[in-house]
C-alpha cells in the first residue's frame, strides 16, 4: 500500500518545521505501507530542501520536493494534486507544516478509511496554548464531531483520502480564494456534494503550534468567517 503525505511549506519558522519533522520521524508506519512525503516549496524557500533531507536521513521515507514559482496555498495544494495524479498511490494526505502528529496517526487513518469504506477521512487539530481565552476561541471555531460521524467537509490540516478521486482532472483547489482562505473546505465540500463519503476520525490527532499572529481576536474572527 503506497501512501503520500503532502506538506505545503508556507512559513519560514524553523521551530515549527522541526517539530513537524520530529513527529513524522516518530510516526508508526505499518509493515504493509510504503510511505512517502512530498514537500511543496515556493522557489524562495527551496533552500529548506537540504535542511529537511538532513532531518530525515535516519528514516527510510522517500522524500519528494515540488517547487512553485508563485506563492499562495491553493497553488501549492494544486501542485501536490498534479504530482499525485502521476503516481500510483493508494491514499494521499495533507498536513500543515506547523503541526505535530501523534505516533499512531497513520495507523488510525488507514484503519478507519478501510473499516468505514470511506473515501475521505478528516481529523481534529489540537492547539498548544495556555491562555484560557485563546482556548475558548478554539473551542468555538474548531469542528467537534463524534468519532465515525459522516461530515460534509474536511480541512487540509488533517486529512487522508483515496488517490483514485483525482482521476477526475477537474478536481482542484480554487485559486480565487488565495487571499481569503477556505479553499480546502470548499474543495472537500465539493467532493461530498459529488457523493464521496467523508468520515470524522477523532483518534487521528494533530497538534498545531500557535503563532503570535493567531493570538489576536481579528485572526479568530476571519477564521470563523471562513468556517461559516
What positions do the PLM features span?
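Short beta-strand-to-loop acidic/aromatic patch adjacent to the donor-nucleotide binding site
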Residues: 89-100
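Catalytic beta-strand/loop signature of glycosyltransferases that borders the donor
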Residues: 198-210
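Conserved donor NDP-sugar-binding/catalytic core segment of glycosyltransferases
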Residues: 104-134
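Acidic donor-binding loop at a coil-to-helix junction in glycosyltransferase catalytic cores
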Residues: 178-189
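Glycine-rich, basic loop-to-helix element that forms the pyrophosphate-binding segment
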Residues: 67-86
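Short, flexible, basic/aromatic active-site loop/helix in glycosyltransferases
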Residues: 134-152
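Catalytic core of nucleotide-sugar-dependent glycosyltransferases
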Residues: 193-196, 206, 216-228
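Short, acidic, metal-binding catalytic loop of nucleotide-sugar glycosyltransferases
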Residues: 22-34
